[in-house]
């Protein structure tokens, strides 16, 4: 059932906005699934990927990477021409799987940057607050992100502190065993 609403949120995203006060929320559903290892968490996203492929929605896996992988970078394709912007995996409308979401819970410099990008990516579509900006030597990258996240992990130590302190949990639907 969760998979259905996850996919439906992406399908209806261009058409649905729910007014709340002076703003709105969109139809995306993002999931943070915490369950013991080797219990089949990844299998659910495999089914989601197949359905998404069949209906024309991109579904990608992500385990780790750089800011450039998430937001994008400038690439020099020809030395005679200026660098060209290459968007990162958070650009556009898609379903995105973090198979080991524990990387988002480890307090290190890299994961903190990743969490900030994901928080921005999950801001309500249509408000302009879901645009990620990265200032680089060759210019500034601005991408609009309309991803739905499917994050899975085992129950890490200190999960209560993360739930209470990290903004990523305010933007996803937590599922636990």
Which residues fall in each region the model found?
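Phosphate-handling catalytic cores of nucleic-acid transaction enzymes
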Residues: 1-177
């Amino acid at each position: 059932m969760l998979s259905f609403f996850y996919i439906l949120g992406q399908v209806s995203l261009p058409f649905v906005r729910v007014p709340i006060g002076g703003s709105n929320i969109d139809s995306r559903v993002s999931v943070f699934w915490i369950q013991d290892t080797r219990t089949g968490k990844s299998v659910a996203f495999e089914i989601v990927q197949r359905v998404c492929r069949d209906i024309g929605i991109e579904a990608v896996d992500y385990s780790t990477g750089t800011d450039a992988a998430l937001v994008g970078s400038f690439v020099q394709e020809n030395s005679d021409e200026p660098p060209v912007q290459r968007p990162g995996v958070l650009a556009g409308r898609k379903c995105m799987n973090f198979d080991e979401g524990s990387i988002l819970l480890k307090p290190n410099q890299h994961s903190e940057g990743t969490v900030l990008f994901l928080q921005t990516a999950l801001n309500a579509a249509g408000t302009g607050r879901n645009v990620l900006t990265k200032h680089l030597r060759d210019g500034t990258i601005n991408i609009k992100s309309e991803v739905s996240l499917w994050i899975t992990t085992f129950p890490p130590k200190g999960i209560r502190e993360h739930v209470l302190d990290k903004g990523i949990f305010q933007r996803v639907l937590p599922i636990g065993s």
